[in-house]
Amino acid sequence: MTKEEIIKPENLVYKKPTLMNDNAMHYCPGCSHGVVHKLIAEVIEEMGMEDKTVGISPVGCAVFAYNYLDIDWQEAAHGRAPAVATAVKRLWPDRLVFTYQGDGDLVCIGTAETIHALNRGENITIIFINNAIYGMTGGQMAPTTLVGMKSSTCPYGRDVELHGYPLKITEIAAQLEGTAYVSRQSVQSVPAIRKAKKAIRKAFENSMNGKGSNLVEIVSTCSSGWKMTPEKANKWMEEHMFPFYPLGDLKDKE
C-alpha cells in the first residue's frame, strides 16, 4: 500500500512542510536545529512567501541549511551573515530576508556585523541558535558558555577572571533603537515549540512591514558538545540555561 492509501487526507493531522525536502539531515540526535528548520518552513508557507524568501546560512553546524529548505539561500563568510542580509534586503526590499546563526558565528566573530545591522534597523530577522558551545568544531567554549560550564577549552569550567562573563547578545539587541522585536524562546517541549513559532512569525512579519530589525534567540541543546544524552541535555538546559537566559519577549515595538 502507498502512503496515501494508508494515511487518508481526512485523517491527516500533521505533515512535513512542503519547503522541507527529503535530504537526510546531518545534525546529531536530539539537536534543536531540525525543529527550528521546520518552524521556519511552516511560517514561510503560511505567509505565502515561498518564492520570495532568502536565507543567509552561517559557518557552523547549520552551514548546510540550504540542503534542507527549498528556498533561495546565500552562504556568508564566518560571522558576516547580517551584512550579507543587509545587502540582499536593500536590493530586494520585497523579499523576506533572514539569517540563521549559532553563538560562535553571531556572538563571537560576527559581533560587529550583528550589532551594527540591528542598530541601523535593517528590515531583516536574525534567528540565533544558542547552545552555549562550539558544536561543529568539537565542543569548545563559546561567548555564551555559562560560568562553571566545562568544555574542551575550559576543562575546569568557565572562569570569570580568566574568560570573562557569558555575553547576553539578546539583551544588548533589545537596547538598540533599530530593533523592533527581540525574543528568546526554546523548542524542548510542545508548548515551547508553539511559542517559538509565534515569535518567528512576528519577526518575519515585522521585517516585511518595514518595522526594523528583529532577533529571535532559540536556547538550545548540544548533546554531542555537552557529552549528554538528548534527554539529559534537555533537563540540564532547563535547570542551568533558562535561569541565565530567561525565555520570553525582551522587546516588542508595536
Where does each model-flagged region fall?
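Glycine-rich beta-alpha junction loops
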Residues: 59-61, 131-133, 189, 218-225
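Structural motif
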Residues: 52-55, 95-98, 123-127, 171, ...
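Flexible, low-complexity linker and terminal segments
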Residues: 1-13, 17, 22, 208-254
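Short, hinge-like loop/turn segments at secondary-structure boundaries
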Residues: 71-74, 117, 142-146, 232-235
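Active-site-proximal loop->helix
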Residues: 111-116, 136-150
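Conserved thiamine diphosphate
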Residues: 15, 142-209
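Thiamine diphosphate
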Residues: 1-135, 198-202, 209
